[in-house]
Amino acid sequence: RYVLAATLSSNVGLYGPAYELLDHEPYPGKEENNHSEKYQLKAWDLDKPGNIRAEIARMNAIRNKHEAFQRTFNIHFIPCSNSHIIAYLKQNFEKTDRFIVVVNMDWENQQGGKLDLTAKALDLGHTGTLRLVDHFADAPKEYLWDDKKPYLELNPQKCPAHIFQIID
């Protein structure tokens, strides 16, 4: 969810510890969080296993470095053969900072699908191989796509999203 919030809009915020630690246990019989700070002072264990602090920091570094994520009205959605996957193009006005963001909307199951990069609205302008670098991976990883309908899989436990920078 944070990848979506951080890439779809130029403005994003979150309530820190509960979100970073994935604390989502509901109070019995209510929607409210069982460990809410509403009526108590809480000392959070920020190093608790299973936190997503590194992913949030990585996403924030990407946002700060790239102009494409500092604008809101520069989104072009990319069709995908699987409705559990959302994909879109983000780019600056000059089209010198361009990204394809792909997110698995199913937080429990691995999902795979083909992206349709043939739409004229995307204006990718490539006729051959598309060179990409995934900045959301633990370490930047390069990909070469020869197909205008590339297939990819996203595992929510290992790789829930890709943030591909298009390298010209």
Where is each model-derived feature located?
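Hydrophobic faces of well-ordered beta-strands that scaffold small-molecule active sites
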Residues: 12-16
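Carbohydrate-interacting/catalytic domains
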Residues: 1, 6-9, 19-168
